[in-house]
Amino acid sequence: MVRKKHPPLRNVASEGEGQTLEPTATESKVSGKNKELSADQMSENTDQSDVAELNSKEEHSTHGQEPSSSGKKDLQISGLSEKAGFNYESPSKGGSLVSFPHDEVTDRNMLAFSSPAAGGVCEPLKSPQRAEADDPQDMACTPSGDSLETKEEHKMSPKATEETGPVQSGQANCQGLSPVSVASKNPQVPSDGGVRLSKPKGDLLVNDNPDPAPLSPELQDFKCNICGYGYYGNDPTDLIKHFRKYHLGLHNRTRQDAELDSKILALHNMVQFSHSKDFQKVNRSVLSGVLQDISSSRPALLNGTYDVQVTSGGTFIGIGRKTPDCQGNTKYFRCKFCNFTYMGNSSTELEQHFLQTHPNKIKVSLPSSEGVKPSEKNSNKSIPALRASDSGDVGKWQDKMTVKAGDDTPVGYSVPIKPLDSSRQNGTEATSYYWCKFCSFSCESSSSLKLLEHYGKQHGAVQSGGLNPELNDKLPRGSVINQNDLAKSVEGEPLTKPEKGLSGAKKKDFPSKGAEDNMVTSYNCQFCDFRYSKSHGPDVIVVGPLLRHYQQLHNIHKCTIKHCPFCPRGLCSPEKHLGEITYPFACRKSNCSHCALLLLHLSPGVAGSSRVKHQCHQCSFSTPDVDVLLFHYETVHESQASDVKQEANHLLGSDGQQAVRDSKEHSCTKCDFITQVEEEISRHYRRAHSCYKCRQCSFTAADTQSLLEHFNTVHCQEQEITTANGEEGGHAIPTIKEEPKIDLKVYSLLNPDSKMGETVPESIVKREKLDDKEGLKDKIWTESSTDDLRGVAWRGADILRGSPSYTQASLGLLTPVSSSQEQTKTLRDSPNVEAAHLARPMYGLAVDTKGFLQGAPAGSEKSASLTQQYPASGESKTKDESQSLLRRRRGSGVFCANCLTTKTSLWRKNANGGYVCNACGLYQKLHSTPRPLNIIKQNNGEQIIRRRTRKRLNPEALQAEQLNKQQRGSGEEQVNGSPLERRSEDHLSESHPREIPLPSLSKYEAQGSLTKSHSAQQPVLVSQALDIHKRMQPLHIQIKSPQESTGDPGNSSSVSDGKGSSERGSPIEKYMRPAKHPNYSPPGSPIEKYQYPLFGVPFVHNDFQSEADWLRFWSKYKLSVPGNPHYLSHVPGLPNPCQNYVPYPTFNLPPHFSAVGSDNDIPLDLAIKHSRPGPTANGASKEKTKAPPTVKNEDPLNVVKTEKVDRSTQDELSTKCVHCGIVFLDEVMYALHMSCHGDSGPFQCSICQHLCTDKYDFTTHIQRGLHRNNAQAEKNGKPKE
């Protein structure tokens, strides 16, 4: 249906044709591949006409219908050419891959083909006739166009082994291609390095995407093969997104990469489908074939249908057809040799059937239908090619010959190549196209020598039996690609390339393994000038030093090491070089996050040839498993690891690591991103690849917890090791090794800073901070990160304590805010930090970014005080930190402390250090008062900022409020013990830091302080919640000791420095809100207000209330005590405010309070002086809330204040609201609050007489000023008369 255009990975295509085809080459490749695969697998097309019909039907249906006639292999080239447009052959027999519409010639496809393949391609190129795998001969050759495309694919894929070969004989190419096609497809992908390919593919695919057929709506289980994430549904989109984000490190923004998505789906389905016992083989064939085919023929996935090849003993025995109606599961399995078909999800039955019914096929398949089976083995590879080009082409599967080794072991196949118009490249009519039966190696040659030589070197130790696929699986990725390169013999050592492929990422050009007993191989690093040459035997390669160099110096995991035999540094793109980029050391394990992309883009082979052994350069130890080799180094030669590093460095030049870092050329190992600025590369990793790297070494971690643990265990103990690069050698490596298991996110990709130990210039820090903020906003936070933070937070202090020997400077990460800037700097600079917003919390060194940006003085005193504080105030630090993070994390659970919204274009801090949305922050900034909730309007969740609808309080109130704020600020600093403003008053930090530990709240308050000198190490969300809790204790909390309520015992008595009550315009809040504790997050969110309404602290500083104000209130709201005696009473029996609701009538005035009395008429303050709860007029509280509290006149209420402090003069309960259960430490506050209660009921509003249902409703009503008569409500500020 949709043609996948693969980037011309390797247009080895013939000069002329290759060039023409190149554009199409990708397309043709893809189509060819798809075709080949489908052709192979689905060769069972009935009459071409029938098939064509089926195809068109299937295309329309998007479900690959089972080929109506699987048996018809008759499709001949002629038929194919006729049906050039015919897309889908019945998949029945051969179709190991889905008979995808990919073969179909769609207008799209035609266009694509036409342009590239000259006329031939345009021809019914796409008639993918899948000759049955059984009869390669039957594989009808598709029109020359197809062959050309196929050829191109082959050329490209085989690295155009002999560029000529594939192109020259369309048929031959098709045939040859079939085997190669898969490989080539895979190689192409690998060459991109996976990522690159995926992108181009995505781009190409974007065009193709139109066809994607809707996936089946049926419900099914979707499960991630790597981490087990799963869900039950009918849409794989979430699974794709999950895989892209968490395993490929890709942002979901690149959704246009449909091909990649298809591959991802295929990969998961593949895992489910690959049941064959020869799973590795299958895996290889399936993954390489199916995934690639699928990827190449994305339509199949989109179509919702594709086939999984089932192999047994290396013999292709049938297909598992997956259709949209059973998405995620194989619908049925079908024998390739007969019509045996059954529904199910396991190929076991098919394998048993094959062994019982077609035992003769086991051996025969290799030699007799060698063409078919090898191609089958190649799975998808060879068969698709079978669609030999036009019937006119000489090369046909019928012409296919088996090439045997001296022992009569089938080594591969050849097809005579006749020059095609389009494929004239190397073509001499005498040339034949050869392809290896065990891997993707293919070449064009006049003799079979190259193939035999390849066989001897790559498969000599292995029997030709079909079982080799495993080896093939291993070799193919690298070796196949390299082999193709070999075929191209672009470099003089074609044979070495397979090795390179295997060991190749190293870029060693080794002479062919088998060729010499001893050979000297040159190894060089892709990222720097590190090089070395080693003499070794034909069966081993010495890649240990290079691997260790990559891991230690470049922090590159072995699975991500790329190799291109044709490019000095292996960083080339297949479009530019004939060689394929391979990942010779990739483990390609399904659970390896580093290989997740590779599995999608590379031919799924096994990493490295089993025959190639990796020799230890320090002893005689050798092993085919790179992981084992690395482990060997770590365990046996750990002490020498540094030598290797040094060697690398020497090779690099004396520059060594510095050459890499100092040169400032930082390249991403996951993609082609290169930059001179370390911060940028760090940001790139963080945003694009979601990985965290240790700044001290090459260790990378998937999460911050792991990173912290690593730091604690490795660097805190090895403080003496200060080398920037792989200093830890063994430590780093083991972790790296395990990283694939741990790290779902993806790769460790940074060169450790050579300067890790050095302090980073502040300018950098500042800039980086800004960058970080951006990064954080951009970054999608996962809950795990917060969990990590939580886990890590508490350890920060320990880390600091545990690494005393590190000088702050040397420990870039841990500089405890020596100057907050330095700290930030170092943290930021460290890739870890960059990568993760993590570093700070992790190391417990978080410094308020804001503070730094503003340029906190970096006085040594400050640092000293901080360092001392650290152990004690780790929490406050984390908290600070978490909050600063909060501010910058969107959608991370942060909510506005004022309006509770979680959506905002920008997080701001209010005067109290709490996080507020842009709207509330701007409002407060402009009006110096919290944004009233009643004016908050939202548009699509985003708050709209508009003018206040209510009149502002009288100017006096505003001034008072401002004064309050000022005092509050200073008070907070004092209260917090930690300088409220580190920026402005560093000296405070010295004096108070030690105070911080005192009250539990102090830490938080300190945090709350604008600057938050130290960032608490608590998780962001938790920190905010804590802030809220700390700032406001739950409603039901009874009077707490002053210390508890305020950071400073001294201040506790009075509203913590009288942080004025009027943070918000709502009345009740003013009484209920603990005077702004420094960390007091904005005037709390609505709920917050009721939930933690009262601090045990008086909410209004008595000192701040001017007597005049009180008199005014008093005159306004004169409380008729007789009518409301209960206001003054306290209910002694109710210890818990929650429980203290007593039916209104039951409240009695305590005997010592007379319901009636001159006191009732006395102004509030006077009443208070009389030790009375001071009945205030019902509206007084409201008014007071609005203005007086803010008015800071310190005269009248001093008495109250002292009284409050002493508290001995009055019963505690006397200041407890019997209705709301709120306990006031301040009588005035109590009186004001009580004045809000009306006479008719416990929850009647005295201002508008509205009867509220309960205390919460009442609180909300008062707070928001929801008075029935708005005019009256506005008047509330004025004497109510």
UniProtKB/Swiss-Prot annotation:
<feature type="cross-link" description="Glycyl lysine isopeptide (Lys-Gly) (interchain with G-Cter in SUMO2)">
    <location>
        <position position="825"/>
    </location>
</feature>
<feature type="compositionally biased region" description="Polar residues">
    <location>
        <begin position="166"/>
        <end position="189"/>
    </location>
</feature>
<feature type="region of interest" description="Disordered">
    <location>
        <begin position="1040"/>
        <end position="1078"/>
    </location>
</feature>
<dbReference type="GO" id="GO:0001942">
    <property type="term" value="P:hair follicle development"/>
</dbReference>
<feature type="region of interest" description="Disordered">
    <location>
        <begin position="1169"/>
        <end position="1195"/>
    </location>
</feature>
<feature type="compositionally biased region" description="Polar residues">
    <location>
        <begin position="21"/>
        <end position="31"/>
    </location>
</feature>
<dbReference type="InterPro" id="IPR036236">
    <property type="entry name" value="Znf_C2H2_sf"/>
</dbReference>
<feature type="modified residue" description="Phosphoserine">
    <location>
        <position position="1066"/>
    </location>
</feature>
<feature type="zinc finger region" description="C2H2-type 6">
    <location>
        <begin position="1215"/>
        <end position="1237"/>
    </location>
</feature>
<dbReference type="GO" id="GO:1902043">
    <property type="term" value="P:positive regulation of extrinsic apoptotic signaling pathway via death domain receptors"/>
</dbReference>
<feature type="zinc finger region" description="C2H2-type 2; atypical">
    <location>
        <begin position="333"/>
        <end position="358"/>
    </location>
</feature>
<keyword id="KW-0238">DNA-binding</keyword>
<feature type="cross-link" description="Glycyl lysine isopeptide (Lys-Gly) (interchain with G-Cter in SUMO2); alternate">
    <location>
        <position position="1201"/>
    </location>
</feature>
<feature type="zinc finger region" description="C2H2-type 4">
    <location>
        <begin position="666"/>
        <end position="689"/>
    </location>
</feature>
<feature type="modified residue" description="Phosphoserine">
    <location>
        <position position="978"/>
    </location>
</feature>
<feature type="compositionally biased region" description="Basic and acidic residues">
    <location>
        <begin position="488"/>
        <end position="515"/>
    </location>
</feature>
<dbReference type="GO" id="GO:0008270">
    <property type="term" value="F:zinc ion binding"/>
</dbReference>
<feature type="cross-link" description="Glycyl lysine isopeptide (Lys-Gly) (interchain with G-Cter in SUMO2)">
    <location>
        <position position="1030"/>
    </location>
</feature>
<feature type="cross-link" description="Glycyl lysine isopeptide (Lys-Gly) (interchain with G-Cter in SUMO2)">
    <location>
        <position position="645"/>
    </location>
</feature>
<feature type="cross-link" description="Glycyl lysine isopeptide (Lys-Gly) (interchain with G-Cter in SUMO2)">
    <location>
        <position position="755"/>
    </location>
</feature>
<protein>
    <recommendedName>
        <fullName>Zinc finger transcription factor Trps1</fullName>
    </recommendedName>
</protein>
<feature type="modified residue" description="Phosphoserine">
    <location>
        <position position="178"/>
    </location>
</feature>
<feature type="cross-link" description="Glycyl lysine isopeptide (Lys-Gly) (interchain with G-Cter in SUMO1); alternate">
    <location>
        <position position="1201"/>
    </location>
</feature>
<feature type="cross-link" description="Glycyl lysine isopeptide (Lys-Gly) (interchain with G-Cter in SUMO2)">
    <location>
        <position position="965"/>
    </location>
</feature>
<feature type="cross-link" description="Glycyl lysine isopeptide (Lys-Gly) (interchain with G-Cter in SUMO2)">
    <location>
        <position position="418"/>
    </location>
</feature>
<feature type="cross-link" description="Glycyl lysine isopeptide (Lys-Gly) (interchain with G-Cter in SUMO); alternate">
    <location>
        <position position="1201"/>
    </location>
</feature>
<feature type="cross-link" description="Glycyl lysine isopeptide (Lys-Gly) (interchain with G-Cter in SUMO2)">
    <location>
        <position position="1070"/>
    </location>
</feature>
<feature type="compositionally biased region" description="Basic and acidic residues">
    <location>
        <begin position="980"/>
        <end position="995"/>
    </location>
</feature>
<feature type="compositionally biased region" description="Polar residues">
    <location>
        <begin position="1040"/>
        <end position="1049"/>
    </location>
</feature>
<keyword id="KW-0862">Zinc</keyword>
<feature type="zinc finger region" description="GATA-type">
    <location>
        <begin position="896"/>
        <end position="920"/>
    </location>
</feature>
<feature type="region of interest" description="Disordered">
    <location>
        <begin position="1"/>
        <end position="101"/>
    </location>
</feature>
<feature type="region of interest" description="Mediates interaction with RNF4">
    <location>
        <begin position="985"/>
        <end position="1184"/>
    </location>
</feature>
<dbReference type="InterPro" id="IPR013087">
    <property type="entry name" value="Znf_C2H2_type"/>
</dbReference>
<keyword id="KW-0832">Ubl conjugation</keyword>
<feature type="cross-link" description="Glycyl lysine isopeptide (Lys-Gly) (interchain with G-Cter in SUMO2); alternate">
    <location>
        <position position="1192"/>
    </location>
</feature>
<feature type="cross-link" description="Glycyl lysine isopeptide (Lys-Gly) (interchain with G-Cter in SUMO2)">
    <location>
        <position position="474"/>
    </location>
</feature>
<feature type="modified residue" description="Phosphoserine">
    <location>
        <position position="90"/>
    </location>
</feature>
<feature type="cross-link" description="Glycyl lysine isopeptide (Lys-Gly) (interchain with G-Cter in SUMO2)">
    <location>
        <position position="879"/>
    </location>
</feature>
<feature type="compositionally biased region" description="Polar residues">
    <location>
        <begin position="862"/>
        <end position="871"/>
    </location>
</feature>
<feature type="cross-link" description="Glycyl lysine isopeptide (Lys-Gly) (interchain with G-Cter in SUMO2)">
    <location>
        <position position="457"/>
    </location>
</feature>
<feature type="region of interest" description="Disordered">
    <location>
        <begin position="484"/>
        <end position="515"/>
    </location>
</feature>
